[in-house]
From Swiss-Prot:
Inhibited by Mg(2+). Its main location: plastid. GO terms for cellular component: chloroplast; chloroplast inner membrane. It is a multi-pass membrane protein. Residues 1-88 form a transit peptide. Gene3D superfamilies: Phosphatidic acid phosphatase type 2/haloperoxidase. It holds the Pfam family PAP2. GO terms for molecular function: phosphatidate phosphatase activity. This is Lipid phosphate phosphatase epsilon 1, chloroplastic. It is an enzyme of class 3 (hydrolase). It comes from Arabidopsis thaliana (Mouse-ear cress). Its EC number is 3.1.3.-. The gene is LPPE1.
Amino acid sequence: MAASSSLLLLLHCPTCNFYFDSSSYLKRSRLSSYSSIISRGSPLFVSSFGSMTVKRFSSRVGSRSNDGNEQFGALEQESFINNSSEIRKDLVTGGGIEAIVNRLSKWVVSVLFGSIILLRHDGAALWAVIGSISNSALSVVLKRILNQERPTTTLRSDPGMPSSHAQSISFISVFAVLSVMEWLGTNGVSLFLSGLILALGSYFIRLRVSQKLHTSSQVVVGAIVGSLFCILWYTMWNSLLREAFEASLLVQISVFLFAATFALAFAAYVVLNWFKDER
């Protein structure tokens, strides 16, 4: 009897339990959701024995993925900011805007000088054309005599003392100031225009140094020589040639022919050199 009852008890005890409580069901449902999320990024086979490992791995992968995205976004933003700052630096400090202004300065000054010549259209204007080109020729002669090298950073090998740009710009600026003072006299308007002309000329001259095409001494010497030559040329006209020009037709024709010859020679120089430099 005892043996039969123990046999019944053994047969009655279940060999395995198929009952799932609510907590185990929730845990397994979460495990399946985590495994499905991970399987989207990479094929991963999850077994029931590695539930805790999968949970920890999924949380780590998720956090690393988020951190990686944030770090990648931060690197992109930092790279964009650095590139923008470099572009602004190039535009401001000489690789961009100032380099463009420096290349255009000779055209701006030439247009200003031509406008003054056309507005004056008198003997002094013709005399100024001759003087401006003579001043440029003097600069070339002085460069050959002094034979001072340019800054080592520039690619140009010709002499740099004195600066031809500084000498020409100074001549034209001083002539423009003298013309304004002659037209308007000494008043607030003439002083303002004169200061504006000198400031613009000084800025163009300074660009030769900031662009490392000349040293400071080269542009200073060029500016002094150009200014003194203009004053001397202007004084020579008023004291020696003005009365002769107004009284003699031969002098008028001679000055006109000289000015036309110098102007044509300068135009040929512009075509052969300035446009080549732009290319």
